[in-house]
């Protein structure tokens, strides 16, 4: 799923998107002018109401499956390709631009609305996940579906995805 491709502590990491996601991530998608989506299904837990999802963005959707492109969200630039090949090809055209104002705004969202739960006198799922975060530098984490899946997605700190990460 790509979770961990950008380390949780990386300054550009904004968290998960959607109804169980981070405020900063949801705001970033809601305010962005360009959204790259790589292998994303755009299910309703991510998009919410389709008419209000990424309303200002041109959406680029990369997926190896033709049927996935524009299935749930109409995209502006459909790319049917292997993700690695598509990204490497697009990198040839990247130029620098001033992103300081945008990154400052995202950092402000992260600071004002961190993903955290209030401490309780009893053991909580977050306490278990905090322990995993402290004990293991790198772990492969698997969950079943349910609330524990959401707690894990929200609070697990990942440094790599199957040993691979974006620097």
Language model: regions and residue ranges:
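Phosphate/pyrophosphate-binding active-site segments
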Residues: 56-145
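Short acidic, glycine/serine/threonine-rich loops at helix termini
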Residues: 7-12, 46-50, 70-74, 90-92, ...
């Amino acid at each position: 799923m790509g979770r961990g491709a950008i380390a949780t502590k990386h300054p550009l990491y904004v968290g998960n998107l959607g109804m169980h996601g981070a405020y900063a991530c949801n705001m970033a998608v809601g305010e962005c002018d360009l959204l790259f989506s790589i292998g994303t299904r755009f299910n309703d837990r991510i998009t919410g109401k389709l008419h209000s999802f990424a309303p200002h963005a041109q959406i680029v959707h990369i997926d190896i499956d033709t049927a996935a492109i524009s299935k749930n969200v109409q995209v502006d630039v459909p790319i049917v390709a292997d993700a690695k090949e598509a990204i490497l090809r697009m990198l040839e055209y990247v130029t620098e631009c001033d992103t300081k104002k945008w990154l400052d705004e995202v950092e402000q969202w992260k600071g004002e609305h961190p993903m955290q739960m209030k401490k309780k006198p009893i053991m909580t799922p977050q306490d278990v996940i905090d322990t995993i975060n402290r004990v293991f530098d790198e772990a492969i984490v698997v969950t079943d579906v349910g609330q524990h899946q959401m707690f894990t997605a929200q609070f697990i700190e990942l440094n790599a995805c199957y040993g691979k990460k974006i620097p």
